[in-house]
UniProtKB/Swiss-Prot annotation:
It comes from Dictyostelium discoideum (Social amoeba). It comes from the Eukaryota. It catalyses: ATP + H2O = ADP + phosphate + H(+). Residues 602-763 form the Helicase C-terminal domain. Pfam families: DEAD, Helicase_C. A motif (Q motif) lies at residues 384-412. It is found in: Cytoplasm; Nucleus. Residues 178-191, 764-774 have a biased composition (Polar residues). Transmembrane segments: none annotated. InterPro entries: DEAD/DEAH_box_helicase_dom (IPR011545), Helicase_ATP-bd (IPR014001), Helicase_C-like (IPR001650), P-loop_NTPase (IPR027417), RNA-helicase_DEAD-box_CS (IPR000629), RNA_helicase_DEAD_Q_motif (IPR014014). The Q motif is unique to and characteristic of the DEAD box family of RNA helicases and controls ATP binding and hydrolysis. Its EC number is 3.6.4.13. This is Probable ATP-dependent RNA helicase ddx17. It is an enzyme of class 3 (hydrolase).
Length: 785
């Protein structure tokens, strides 16, 4: 039975495949989007791809296999014998693939106990593929090594799943003979440049009693193992049969997404006990050359050391442990000793002479004009013009080139606070310029810190609730941080973790991350947050709404407590207040707009009350009244609702596209690209797109399904009328939304919007008496319902 995959199609999403029960599939896609049959969309995800370019994913280094990326799949291998061609070439995993670069082991001519390359493949796991001829590959899995869902190895007694080969009788107690030349890895699993041992794929064989018959071309060995290859272990990398420090050296379950660098084992880049920057022991990090000679050609922190005496002295490096508990439980809070931490500079503010001349009356008048309120001690005056901002010349050039007339209200007050090194809480509506409010001061902060070394963590960490918002922040970072040669990376779920980890390993000054993926990487020990001195929590209220509070607290426990922290939020609920109380020090609060929940006054709000079955007709009627090229976001409550509405709109002649959490990251990127570029004017979305999408020319927002809270309603309609533009929101309410009617009326009243009589009727609280008929806002048509 062969596993063959070919792809002769082209186009961005060539997923026209058939079948999912066979091990053979063919893609002949054109440029159609998302047309699939079967369930093989799940076979084409990050890591362990089943159905990518098979010429590189499977057996691309095969010797005498069927070629062109095909190899046979031996489901029922012999448990007692194996044969190997004298010219066999076996590879462990793909030679080239999305997450793999090198073959695991080199071939060995004439060997007798080859793990792969035998006539009877060893493994029958769902992700393992072995050739019945001399060319074979052990296969890839989602974790970059043998998935432990298959059957046990050939010749093993009592082994379970996976592919770790350790035994008490091998030449090396680690279960693997030490490589004779450099060991390199990618995603933890690419291998030595020469064999690990004398065996065909570098594996020490278990003790055997052997009878051998040879010919000029083959050697057949009958093996009776005295111990099992796996020794009963159930996951890759375990050593339970006499090995004290096997490949991974685990005496406890390893971290999922196994990587040797996360523990003290062969091939580890930095053992868990190594000190921070131990590659240059005792070196004075404080005397390093600062980028651009620091801020204003000054130097800072010329004392203390980042070498062996400071960071790392507690023995932690990323605090990676076995993931034996709930998500994030492997991260232990660090007990920080501030007296041993190297100093860092965070006050760079040089007040412009024009700002110094402002009278208190002028300052109060400026703040009042934007409904700005500030709380805290020693609040610096706002910056009213870009020329008054104390940014370096290269940043000013970028700002002027962007064509901004003046700072937004939040920027005018946040910049001097942030540049003074103070903690800040910024409360402002969406589309108010919060990203640049924290980004530009962060660039100044970075340029005054010691330069990064390899394997250092970031200096600036920005946490965002969604990958869309994280990517938008990265886009702004690339625009304004490029001239200063500041590097950044974006860490979020749904994309290749290997690529993200590789960027972190090189060293980046700014990391923009969603909490879940960052926790995952921290637990695996691939990076650390010991260099972070500038922390940003963007859309903090949204992160708490999404349940990220435990992850946020875990992440902050890994950051030195004397950092500078900036928190931005559109609302100020008690949960956000509690978070600010716990993690901000001597902060200044800046609130733009009313302290009540209010909507953008530039949005014309249209509200209609109807029955549920009327909603589609009313939506289509409204969309028919707007220009065909105008950008519209339609919000639905569920993923199924998004897909259903897309079909309805397409059938009705409206060009539309949908986005929700079930779509892969490439699909979501494609949808956003089509919508941003105007190729598709209507985007249907769940609330995954209701926050952080910075698309400035959205004219209309349609609430097909009214949200569960007024806060979400305000965030949704905030997608339009950004950066001073005007927009329109159109919302459909049913009797199911009656509990929100009073709050909605308050929002409409504050924004001086028209209140329909049906909404007023809906806001009347019906009697709870059992004799009271069901309330309806439609007295004229009540008999019809």
């Amino acid at each position: 039975m062969s596993y063959n995959s070919s792809n002769s199609g082209s186009g961005r999403y060539d997923d026209n495949r058939s079948g999912n029960s066979s091990y053979s599939s063919t893609s002949r896609g054109g440029s159609s989007y998302g047309n699939r049959s079967g369930s093989d969309r799940d076979y084409n995800r990050d890591g362990g791809s089943y159905n990518r370019d098979s010429s590189r994913d499977y057996n691309s280094s095969s010797g005498s296999g069927s070629g062109n990326g095909s190899s046979s799949y031996n489901k029922y291998p012999s448990s007692s014998s194996s044969s190997s061609s004298s010219s066999s070439t076996s590879s462990y995993g793909p030679s080239k693939g999305k997450d793999f670069q090198d073959s695991w082991g080199s071939s060995s001519t004439g060997t007798t106990n080859g793990y792969n390359g035998s006539s009877n493949g060893y493994n029958s796991s769902s992700n393992g593929y072995n050739s019945s001829n001399s060319s074979s590959s052990y296969g890839a899995s989602n974790n970059g090594y043998n998935n432990s869902s298959g059957s046990s190895s050939s010749g093993s007694s009592g082994s379970s799943n996976g592919g770790s080969y350790n035994n008490s009788g091998s030449s090396n107690s680690n279960g693997y003979s030490k490589p004779t030349s450099n060991y390199s890895y990618s995603n933890g699993y690419t291998g030595p440049t020469t064999n690990y041992s004398s065996y065909s794929n570098g594996y020490s064989t278990p003790p055997t009693s052997t009878s051998t018959s040879s010919s000029s071309t083959t050697t057949t060995t009958t093996t009776t193992p005295s111990t099992s290859y796996n020794g009963g272990s159930t996951s890759y990398g375990y050593s339970t049969s006499g090995s004290s420090n096997g490949y991974g050296g685990y005496s406890q379950p390893p971290i999922p997404s196994y990587d040797p660098s996360s523990v003290s084992s062969y091939g580890a880049v930095t053992p868990a006990s190594s000190s921070y920057n131990a590659s240059v022991p005792g070196s004075s990090y404080g005397n390093s050359t600062y980028r651009s000679s620091g801020y204003g050609n000054q130097s800072y922190a010329t004392t203390n050391s980042y070498g062996s005496s400071s960071y790392g002295s507690s023995g932690f490096y990323g605090n990676a442990k076995a993931n034996t508990g709930s998500f994030g439980s492997a991260l232990s809070p660090i007990s920080w000793d501030l007296s041993k931490l190297p100093r860092f500079e965070k006050n760079f503010y040089l007040e412009h002479p024009d700002v110094s001349k402002f009278t208190q009356e002028e300052i109060e008048k400026f703040r009042a004009s934007f409904q700005m309120t500030v709380k805290g001690r020693e609040v610096p005056p706002p910056i009213m013009q870009f020329t008054q901002a104390p940014f370096p010349g290269y940043l000013m050039k970028e700002i002027i080139g962007a064509g901004f007339p003046n700072p937004t209200p939040i920027q005018s007050q946040a910049w001097p606070i942030a540049l003074k090194g103070r903690d800040i809480i910024g409360l402002a509506k969406t589309g108010s310029g919060k990203t640049l409010a924290f980004l530009l001061p962060s660039i100044v902060h970075i340029n005054a810190q010691p330069v990064l070394r390899e394997d250092d963590g970031p200096i600036v960490l920005v946490l965002a609730p969604t990958r869309e918002l994280a990517l938008q922040i990265q886009e702004e970072t690339n625009k304004f941080g490029g001239t200063s040669q500041i590097s950044n990376t974006c860490v979020y779920g749904g994309a290749s973790k290997h690529t993200q980890v590789a960027a972190l390993k090189k060293g980046v000054e700014i990391v923009i991350a969603t909490p879940g993926r960052l926790i995952d990487i921290l637990e695996s020990g691939k990076t650390n947050l010991r260099r972070v001195t500038y922390l940003v929590l963007d859309e903090a209220d949204r992160m708490l709404d999404m349940g990220f509070e435990p992850q946020i607290r875990k992440i902050i426990s890994q950051i030195r407590p004397d950092r500078q922290t900036l928190m931005f939020s559109a609302t100020w609920p008690k949960e956000v207040q509690a978070l600010a109380h716990d993690f901000l020090t001597d902060h200044i609060q800046v609130h733009i707009g009313s302290t009540e929940i209010t909507a953008n006054h530039n949005v014309r709000q249209i509200v209609e009350v109807c029955q549920d079955f009327e909603k589609k007709e009313r939506m289509l009627s409204f969309l028919g009244s707007v220009g065909r090229d105008e950008k519209v976001i339609v919000f639905a409550e569920t993923r199924k609702g998004v897909d259903d509405l897309q079909r309805v709109l397409q059938f009705s002649g409206f060009k539309s596209i949908g986005i929700h959490g079930n779509k892969s990251q490439p699909e979501r990127d494609f949808v956003l690209s089509q919508f941003k570029n105007g190729m598709v004017p209507i985007m249907i979305a769940t609330d995954v797109a209701s926050r952080g999408l910075d698309i400035k020319d959205i004219k209309y927002v349609v609430n097909y399904d009214f949200p569960n809270t007024i806060e979400v309603y305000i965030h949704r309609i905030g997608r339009t009328a950004r950066a001073g533009a005007s927009g329109v929101s159109y919302s459909l309410l049913t009797t199911d939304n009656a509990r929100l009617a009073n709050e909605l009326i308050k929002v409409l009243t504050e924004a001086k919007q028209k209140i329909p009589i049906e909404l007023s009727n809906l806001s009347v609280t019906p009697s709870t008496s059992s004799n009271t008929k069901k309330f309806s806002p439609y007295p004229t048509y009540s008999k019809r319902y």
